């Protein structure tokens, strides 16, 4: 049949097919392709390689675990159910990458809840932060048959920071930036299961009864000081604000570190048998802890409490009065 004898609809269909084929050929032969490598600056590439839940993004390591279990879409649509399913996998699979992913994804979901306009979501955020701290502890200490990660593993360094932040946020009360860190004995119902919390009194020249409140040192930027005395390690650095007993007697501001130890594994957690121990250390008394025969340094910050105590302009005025007075006008505990 000649082209002139063909129906108009057939000729039109052929034109459409030819046009579509032309578009496809041009898309593949053009300047962009579906898969490619774009040259960029070293700084931009570093940001892409090192993105984690700590800066509000899902790392490549956590995304790999989600992809392996076909849970990427579910984490976007139903994060709680996704975290529950990943925990079930962690009970069957001792690989450390599952624990790392659970630590990061719980932290990421907790951070998203803190930005919610619903009061219930903000309160629930600390439960996911606590779960993140427990998973990070499992990952760092080696749960089950999984060995502790190599210190050169990038996930090891990120997990330490996740743990330190999540320990404080797991017991935070109030809304940011006015949260205080307050903990007590008892049970906490988390998505994987209930955990029992035990507390240990600090050993040093102050007790918990001497402290009015603890503040997260990580949420303070210091001004007017040349350096910040900070030691890297494990634990949440805190500012302990002492109680003011008399009007002219100022409570001390002391540096402390809160450490969480989890005695058990993911399976014990699912069974409701996980015990979490909270230990608070005075920075002036302890700078490390013992863990399975190893000495682990504590994360400490001695400058933040000092700078915080100088926030009060009254201290500056009284300091001037005290300098020119032969009598003791300022007393501390």
Located regions from the model:
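Flexible, membrane-associating and regulatory peripheral segments of lipid-active enzymes
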Residues: 32-89, 93, 98, 104-333
């Amino acid at each position: 049949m000649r082209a002139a004898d063909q129906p108009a609809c057939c000729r039109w269909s052929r034109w459409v097919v030819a046009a579509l084929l032309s578009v496809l050929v041009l898309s593949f032969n053009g300047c962009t392709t579906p898969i490619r490598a774009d040259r960029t600056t070293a700084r931009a590439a570093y940001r892409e390689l090192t993105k984690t839940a700590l800066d509000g993004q899902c790392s490549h390591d956590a995304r790999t675990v989600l992809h392996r279990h076909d849970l990427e879409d579910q984490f976007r649509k139903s994060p709680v159910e996704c975290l529950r399913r990943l925990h079930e996998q962690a009970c069957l699979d001792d690989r450390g990458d599952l624990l790392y992913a659970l630590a990061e994804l719980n932290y990421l979901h907790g951070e998203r809840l803190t930005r919610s306009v619903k009061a219930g979501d903000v309160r629930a955020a600390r439960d996911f932060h606590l779960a993140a701290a427990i998973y990070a502890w499992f990952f760092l200490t080696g749960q089950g048959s999984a060995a502790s990660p190599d210190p050169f593993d990038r996930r090891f360094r990120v997990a330490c920071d996740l743990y330190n932040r999540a320990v404080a946020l797991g017991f935070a009360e109030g809304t940011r930036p006015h949260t205080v860190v307050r903990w007590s004995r008892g049970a906490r119902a988390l998505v994987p299961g209930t955990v029992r919390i035990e507390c240990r009194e600090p050993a040093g020249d102050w007790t918990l009864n001497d402290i009015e409140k603890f503040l997260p040192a990580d949420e303070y930027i210091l001004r007017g000081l040349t350096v910040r005395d900070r030691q890297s390690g494990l634990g949440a650095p805190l500012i302990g604000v002492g109680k003011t007993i008399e009007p002219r007697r100022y409570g001390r501001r002391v540096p402390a570190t809160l450490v969480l130890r989890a005695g058990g594994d993911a399976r014990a957690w699912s069974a409701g048998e996980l015990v979490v121990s909270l230990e608070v250390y005075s920075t002036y008394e302890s700078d490390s802890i013992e863990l399975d025969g190893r000495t682990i340094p504590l994360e400490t910050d001695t400058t933040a409490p000092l700078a915080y105590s100088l926030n009060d302009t009254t201290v500056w005025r009284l300091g001037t009065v005290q300098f020119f007075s032969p009598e003791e006008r300022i007393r501390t505990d």
